[in-house]
A protein has these predicted regions:
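SAM-dependent transferase fold signal centered on methyltransferase-like domains
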Residues: 1-333
Length: 333
């Protein structure tokens, strides 16, 4: 005989209203399936006190019942298999997992996530002139390239050939909300274009540059893939290329966290008076915004003023180290 549990019998026209009320009050038993017949909906509920019953009576008429509510079937998760929640990042159909129990995590991800076709693990920090990482193949198809979707755009990415992380997605959207149609934007370290193309889509006139030839090829492909034409793409040293645009930029993006400080002077020269620079760096937890001193020193060398508009932690980078952003306005005399 099937085991019966507590529920509420509600006329169909009130079913959705009551379901939402139960969810809001934390009283819907999500481990069991909702039942229905031609005239009524049967909602599985958790134990409730008399005060909750009185509140629900104000939502819609109901009748308490004991009924067979079958268990709610849900897909298995990596946590179900492993016994803990693993840490991983997903770019397109590629999952990036940490070394250690990488094989076990990879097997759990492949088994439970239809969208994941590749599992790799980084075996180096961001390194070299083109700020790339090396990876070890763990499971699935043997590749590091994929198509990643973010904020309505598609990006062709080769994780071993050009740096990309989906963990900056929220930050990219924050910047997009600050940029107005018609603004002139200089993206000094554009990579495959996640800042540049999002801002161009919003109507900004974008100049995107990078020294990495593979990143530039991906960026060019991504501009075509997303049918974006209001962008100029340049391959070369940002310190030199930025000087083509002295005094023109409404916004300058400096997403090169490990060495952006070396490019502060050309970035400020490219900004117009009143323009805003979005500066990213890696900093220790006990001195998150220490690079403000470097920003002011660079401004002093140009006889310019700076006004810090925003400081924030973008993401945790390593134990007691964070990727931070400092937005500042440049004022030229």
């Amino acid at each position: 005989m099937a085991e019966e549990s507590s529920g509420l019998r509600v006329r169909r026209e009130y079913g959705e209203r009551m379901r939402k009320a139960l969810v809001e009050k934390g009283l819907l038993d999500r481990s069991r399936k909702i039942r229905a017949d031609e005239s009524h909906v049967y909602l599985p509920v958790l134990d409730m006190d008399s005060a909750s019953r009185i509140e629900l009576e104000q939502i819609a008429p109901f009748e308490p019942v004991q009924k067979d509510f079958p268990p709610e079937e849900r897909p298995a998760t990596p946590e179900d298999i492993l016994g803990y929640r693993p840490s991983f990042e997903v770019v397109g159909d590629i999952a990036l997992v940490e070394e250690g129990d990488a094989e076990a995590v990879a097997a759990a991800l492949i088994a439970t996530s239809k969208g994941i076709k590749v599992v790799i693990s980084p075996i180096s920090e961001v390194e070299g002139e083109f700020r790339t990482r090396r990876f070890r193949h763990i499971a699935g198809e043997a590749r590091t390239s994929t198509i990643h979707k973010e904020h309505g755009l598609r990006y062709r990415v080769d994780l071993e050939g050009a740096y990309f992380t989906e963990r900056l997605g929220t930050e990219r959207l924050r910047i997009a909300k600050l940029v107005k149609p018609g603004d002139f934007v200089l993206d000094m370290f554009a990579g495959v274009g996640p800042f540049s193309l999002l801002l161009a889509k919003k109507g900004a006139q974008v100049v995107a540059m990078d020294k990495n030839p593979l990143a530039i090829r991906c960026l060019q492909e991504n501009a075509v893939l997303n049918k974006i034409r209001n962008i100029e793409i340049l391959e070369g040293d940002a310190a030199e290329l930025a000087l083509r645009y002295v005094g023109r930029a409404d916004h300058v993006i400096m997403n090169l966290p490990h060495s952006a400080s070396s490019f502060l002077v050309p970035a400020m020269r490219a900004a117009k008076s009143g323009g805003v620079v979005h500066y990213y760096c890696i900093a220790p937890e006990d001195d998150l915004y220490r690079d403000e001193a470097l920003i002011r020193k660079a401004a002093d060398s140009l006889g310019a003023g700076v006004d810090v508009l925003y400081r924030g932690i973008v993401r945790s980078y390593a134990p007691r180290r964070h990727n931070v952003v400092i937005d500042f306005r440049v004022t030229k005399k």
